[in-house]
């Protein structure tokens, strides 16, 4: 433990509110310990207000976020190339009334029933959600927190829900963001974490 603390201290800048020169893994762990309950978005460019076009796909298009560092840890171990392209981590807040919240596999089934693209689903032999129809009821995103990882549909029709990697959400109209604070940024000498 003493060695870990000594190694961690070497990254402290003169400014005690900033950690500098961190690897992606170190940055992720630092945020995990200090921002565990926050909604964090990992991006390759600065956040700007925009609307992502939706269609009938397995997952919606948009700004994905996760609770704490769960997405960053998934990226670090499963999607290494994405971690190499990342440049910013934002803590975000938003108008929750604009988000469709799916807290269980059963709720995902109901959403699928209500917003299924029947033509595409029949051709693909799996349920495909028409995310554009969800935008038409005034929703600007969807959230899977908590995520029912153990849910599995016996007939494999809910593949889209099983493909959610971590407790997360997707915002396709970022104008609902009430907070977008950069909390980590990739610099020349590594990641800088602002506390």
What annotation goes with each model-predicted range?
Residues 17-52, 79-195:
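Active-site and NAD+-binding cores of ADP-ribose-processing enzymes
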Residues 1-16:
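Short acidic, low-complexity intrinsically disordered linear motifs used
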Residues 6, 10, 73-77, 113, ...:
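Charged/polar, solvent-exposed surface patches and flexible loops
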Residues 47-85:
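Extended catalytic/binding region for NAD+/ADP-ribose chemistry, centered on the ART fold
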């Amino acid at each position: 433990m003493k060695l870990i603390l000594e190694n961690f201290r070497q990254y402290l800048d003169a400014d005690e509110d900033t950690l500098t020169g961190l690897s992606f893994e170190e940055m992720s762990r630092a945020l995990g310990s200090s921002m565990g309950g926050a909604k964090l978005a990992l991006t390759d460019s600065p956040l700007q207000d925009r609307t992502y076009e939706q269609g009938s796909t397995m997952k919606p298009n948009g700004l994905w976020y996760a609770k704490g560092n769960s997405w960053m840890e998934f990226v670090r171990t499963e999607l290494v190339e994405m971690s190499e392209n990342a440049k910013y981590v934002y803590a975000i807040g938003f108008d929750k009334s604009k988000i469709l919240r799916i807290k269980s596999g059963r709720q995902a089934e109901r959403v699928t029933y209500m917003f299924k693209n029947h033509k595409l689903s029949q051709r693909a032999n799996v349920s495909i959600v028409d995310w554009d129809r969800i935008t038409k009821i005034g929703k600007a995103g969807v959230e899977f927190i908590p995520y029912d990882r153990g849910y599995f549909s016996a007939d494999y029709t809910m593949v889209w829900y099983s493909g959610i990697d971590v407790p997360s959400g997707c915002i396709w109209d970022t104008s609902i963001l009430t907070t977008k604070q950069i909390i980590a940024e990739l610099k020349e000498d590594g990641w800088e974490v602002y506390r």
